[in-house]
Design a protein with these regions (language model features):
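Position-specific recognition of the canonical hydrophobic site in helix A of tetratricopeptide repeat
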Residues: 23, 57-58, 92, 126
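Residue-level recognition of tetratricopeptide repeat
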Residues: 20, 54-55, 89, 123
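Terminal, low-structured helical/coil segments at or just beyond the last alpha-helical repeat
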Residues: 61, 133-183
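Structural marker of alpha-solenoid helical repeat scaffolds
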Residues: 3-7, 41, 76, 110-111, ...
């Protein structure tokens, strides 16, 4: 391989690592700039397409663009659970709940131990009024958060899911009428 090609590949890898770093640090503008460099070098990079699209969707901005990026990632790798989750989450953020269900269910089926995917599916079920299913998915998410490796553990994400379960239980308890009480 030529030195020019090697340099080009090294630069693309550098931009990709930088994009992930900036996104993780909450520096979204810098992350976007790096993702654009990565996709300029390889417009079919499924990981970059998905990560960039998910970053936009999760922030609730440019949702049509986010959905397009994620669909392009899925076109490259149609069975990737993370990409399916991202698509479902982008639809969720657009209030396209009926469209969100299938990709989120597929993602949870393929990656049944991913706490984020399980939480997203729980969020969808809550929006659809499927309280029992929402609680079940959120509980699975909590259980999986307790199993993740220390380097991947995100206590704030675990706390968010636990709060959703508590809020759902409080709401359901308030909806019960005195005639519903068991002796």
């Amino acid at each position: 391989m030529s030195k020019t090609w090697e340099h080009y590949k090294d630069a693309a890898r550098h931009h990709e690592r930088a994009a992930y770093h900036y996104k993780g640090a909450g520096k979204f503008d810098q992350a976007e700039e790096q993702f654009r460099h990565v996709l300029q070098a390889n417009p079919r990079n499924p990981a970059a397409l998905n990560y960039y699209g998910y970053m936009l969707a999760d922030r609730g901005i440019r949702l049509d663009e986010a959905t397009d990026l994620i669909k392009r990632a899925i076109a490259e790798d149609p069975t990737n659970a993370a990409y399916l989750d991202s698509l479902g989450w982008a639809y969720f953020k657009q209030n396209r709940f009926s469209e969100a269900e299938e990709p989120l269910r597929q993602a949870a089926s393929r990656e049944s131990h991913d706490p984020t995917i399980l939480s997203h599916l729980g969020d969808l079920y809550a929006k659809l009024g499927k309280d029992n299913l929402a609680e079940a998915q959120w509980q699975k998410s909590v259980d999986e958060w307790h199993r993740v490796l220390p380097g991947n553990f995100e206590p704030e994400r675990l706390a968010e899911v636990e709060q959703k379960i508590s809020a759902l239980k409080r709401r359901l308890a308030q909806q019960k009428t005195p005639g519903d009480a068991k002796p």
